[in-house]
């Protein structure tokens, strides 16, 4: 069964072009030009990945992203017409997993789609039974079910946040560099990410875990090196 991709962009030429390239890769595509149509699709259809334009008339792509994150954990890629840190950081902060700036190469977008889907599937249930649960100081990560609990309360994490936390816990006691996190999460399809990308995801993780940068209980910053979770 082919993966189902949602594409929302009011620029018909871009949406149609992305649809063409996705279908050439045998994906099932739900294409919409308005937020209203997209929100109806989200409520009634099974989606594996969403591609959302930030600048939509009426309801923005950021609002759609937030509504998706209220119920779903599948990857979200944001399309932005502005190459600014504010747009990118805002998207990542509210739950997006990746972004790409217009104009973009269709093949680059397809590569990112494949990378996000591969990572999401990998971390959603491929470990052996005796390796699928990570437990540490009140934190429980189930790799198979893609669920995370802190002090018996479930955390709502994006796929990228889940991956970062899993990697840090699997390497607890050791410093994990931003470069290694980049490689583990985005793989060979990593292109030109901002240096702030991992920082934003870490900050969002800390907020959800009620952790602080000054006196962290879980995620510690080792300045100039990376991040670690103490044993």
Swiss-Prot record:
Residues 4-117 form the Response regulatory domain. The keyword Ion transport does not apply. It comes from the Bacteria. GO terms for molecular function: phosphorelay response regulator activity; transcription cis-regulatory region binding. Residues 131-231 bind DNA. Gene3D superfamilies: 3.40.50.2300, 6.10.250.690, Winged helix-like DNA-binding domain superfamily/Winged helix DNA-binding domain. The modification 4-aspartylphosphate is found at residue 53. GO terms for cellular component: cytosol; protein-DNA complex. Phosphorylated by VanS. Dephosphorylated by VanS. Can be phosphorylated nonenzymatically by acetyl-phosphate. Signal peptide: none annotated. Keywords: Activator, Antibiotic resistance, Cell wall biogenesis/degradation, Cytoplasm, DNA-binding, Phosphoprotein, Plasmid, Repressor, Transcription, Transcription regulation, Two-component regulatory system. It is found in: Cytoplasm. SUPFAM superfamilies: C-terminal effector domain of the bipartite response regulators (SSF46894), CheY-like (SSF52172). InterPro entries: CheY-like_superfamily (IPR011006), OmpR/PhoB-type_DNA-bd (IPR001867), Sig_transdc_resp-reg_C-effctor (IPR016032), Sig_transdc_resp-reg_receiver (IPR001789), WalR-like (IPR039420), WH-like_DNA-bd_sf (IPR036388). Member of the two-component regulatory system VanS/VanR. Binds to the promoter regions of target genes, including vanH and vanR; phosphorylation of VanR increases binding affinity to the vanH and vanR promoters significantly. DNA binding may be inhibited by the cognate sensor protein, VanS. Activates the transcription of vanH, vanA and vanX in response to vancomycin which results in vancomycin resistance. Involved in conferring vancomycin resistance. Monomer. This is Regulatory protein VanR. The gene is vanR.
């Amino acid at each position: 069964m082919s993966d189902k991709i949602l594409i929302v962009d009011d620029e018909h030429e871009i949406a149609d072009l992305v649809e063409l390239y996705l279908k050439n890769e045998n994906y099932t595509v739900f294409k919409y030009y308005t937020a209203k149509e997209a929100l109806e699709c989200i409520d009634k259809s099974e989606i594996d990945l969403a591609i959302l334009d930030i600048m939509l008339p009426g309801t923005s792509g950021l609002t759609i992203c937030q509504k998706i994150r209220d119920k779903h954990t599948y990857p979200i890629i944001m399309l932005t017409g502005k190459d600014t840190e504010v747009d990118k950081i805002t998207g990542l902060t509210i739950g997006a997993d990746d972004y790409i700036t217009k104009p973009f190469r269709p093949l680059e977008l397809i590569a990112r789609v494949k990378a996000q889907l591969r990572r999401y599937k990998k971390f959603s249930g491929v470990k052996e039974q005796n390796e699928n649960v990570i437990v540490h100081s009140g934190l429980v990560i189930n790799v198979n079910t893609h669920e995370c609990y802190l002090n018996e309360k479930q955390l709502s994490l994006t796929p990228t946040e889940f991956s970062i936390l899993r990697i840090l816990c699997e390497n607890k006691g050791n410093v994990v560099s931003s470069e290694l996190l980049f490689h583990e999460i985005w793989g060979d399809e990593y292109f030109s990410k901002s240096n702030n990308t991992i920082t934003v995801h870490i900050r969002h993780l800390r907020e959800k875990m009620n952790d602080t940068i000054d006196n962290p209980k879980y995620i510690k910053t080792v300045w100039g090196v990376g991040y670690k979770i103490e044993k």
